[in-house]
Amino acid sequence: VGFKAGVKDYKLTYYTPDYETKDTDILAAFRVTPQPGVPPEEAGAAVAAESSTGTWTTVWTDGLTSLDRYKGRCYHIEPVPGEESQFIAYVAYPLDLFEEGSVTNMFTSIVGNVFGFKALRALRLEDLRIPPAYTKTFWGPPHGIQVERDKLNKYGRPLLGCTIKPKLGLSAKNYGRAVYECLRGGLDFTKDDENVNSQPFMRWRDRFLFCAEAIFKAQAETGEIKGHYLNATAGTCEEMMKRAVFARELGVPIIMHDYLTGGFTANTSLAHYCRDNGLLLHIHRAMHAVIDRQKNHGMHFRVLAKALRMSGGDHIHAGTVVGKLEGERDITLGFVDLLRDDFVEKDRSRGIFFTQDWVSLAGVLPVASGGIHVWHMPALTEIFGDDSVLQFGGGTLGHPWGNAPGAVANRVALEACVQARNEGRDLAREGNEIIEEASKWSPELAAACAIWKKIKFEFEPVDTI
């Protein structure tokens, strides 16, 4: 019989406004900026086609399968308020398009090719709805929030961390000394910076050994369980696993991975190893702003956060709302809830386009890090709540008396804020008062308050692109 060759409009096949989404569909919300003259329906359908079964022309092998069963469908289009040339295209993908348990395959399909499409000026993936049928094919976080608290025996407050600075250039022994001083002063965790791997000035094995010594010494002296995020990120998966195995042999509680630069395949392998071997896994989001900072093109961080919860990690950096790195309060709390909670309702005011049911997938602790110090403690305690890690790098190591007093100042400030909150005080209104009261009996906190009182990072965002 032959077939009708030639180029055809995508919207004839892939724009289906009458489609009723299934419980098993993966749903995507794209912010689409089409080229002038391209109608919204055609642009939305093009996104659905190019990220599923479509190609630019009709091919005879289309007749050998059921396109209706496997194609993505653009089922709804809505304008973006305040933007003339933009709209949100909602696309539904049948579950059979995706390999089970593979974030790599999911992203290769949904965002792998379509972002370079000529008919679009810009394209941004704003949100994904992951159905329970797909969620259940992932292991998710190695342990989750409750198991982590049980391992650490720490309840009822946020956890405290510190990134060791300067991030590059210290010898392993001096690095270990800084770790010991911070943990001894009262922090729960210290952290390798994301770009500390295995450089000529400090090879990974030396760092692991000195940090392990620091952890066990601080534990013995304080009676608290301590940890240091040993960065296992490496140039090959085999080398990464070798570092994870060595960390486990040392008996440390937690390791770390840069999940975007390391890649989802490596991250999922590492998360599986951590679950099998009792290691917690801290995740750094290095490179995220390359993908998520532009509001018209790329991918929103809430999508990367969902992907991490599926791939596996017990902590992930999530912005601060109050520090030096960008993060709008409602939007940030939207993806913080997506990391921690089992069920999150659709709420467009917080950027959540779909109701997300994680069924029994464990939660991830959000990490607030970047330009924060003791005066931020009341706001951070109120915004992030107990299930979070508050991480002060310069805010610990920049203390005028040294690392250990810097750690003491942070711990005293945190305990004061938690106690005040538990007594029913309003942290938002009385925050400075609470810190000032605590500083009267903690000289370390008083010194920290004096040095950082005037520091603020409240710049207006300059990006309007």
UniProtKB/Swiss-Prot annotation:
MF terms (GO), sorted A to Z: magnesium ion binding; monooxygenase activity; ribulose-bisphosphate carboxylase activity
N6-carboxylysine found at: K191
Entry binding sites for Mg(2+): K191, D193, E194
Gene Ontology CC entries for this record: chloroplast
Pfam family, one: RuBisCO_large_N
Active-site annotation: K165, H284
Cellular compartment(s): Plastid, Chloroplast
Residues bound to substrate: N113, T163, K167, R285, H317, S369
Residues modified to N6,N6,N6-trimethyllysine: K4
Any one biological process term the GO annotation gives: photorespiration
Reaction catalysis annotation: 2 (2R)-3-phosphoglycerate + 2 H(+) = D-ribulose 1,5-bisphosphate + CO2 + H2O; D-ribulose 1,5-bisphosphate + O2 = 2-phosphoglycolate + (2R)-3-phosphoglycerate + 2 H(+)
Domain of life: Eukaryota
Record Gene3D superfamilies: Ribulose bisphosphate carboxylase, large subunit, C-terminal domain, RuBisCO large subunit, N-terminal domain
E.C. designation(s): 4.1.1.39
Enzyme class: lyase
PROSITE patterns per UniProt: RUBISCO_LARGE
Classification via InterPro entries: RuBisCO (IPR033966), RuBisCo_large_chain_AS (IPR020878), RuBisCO_lsu_C (IPR000685), RuBisCO_lsu_C_sf (IPR036376), RuBisCO_lsu_fd_N (IPR017443), RuBisCO_lsu_N_sf (IPR036422), RuBisCO_lsuI (IPR020888)
Other information: The basic functional RuBisCO is composed of a large chain homodimer in a 'head-to-tail' conformation. In form I RuBisCO this homodimer is arranged in a barrel-like tetramer with the small subunits forming a tetrameric 'cap' on each end of the 'barrel'.
Annotated family: Belongs to the RuBisCO large chain family. Type I subfamily.
HAMAP family in the record: RuBisCO_L_type1
Protein function: RuBisCO catalyzes two reactions: the carboxylation of D-ribulose 1,5-bisphosphate, the primary event in carbon dioxide fixation, as well as the oxidative fragmentation of the pentose substrate in the photorespiration process. Both reactions occur simultaneously and in competition at the same active site.
Name listed for the protein in its UniProt record: Ribulose bisphosphate carboxylase large chain
Gene name in the database record: rbcL
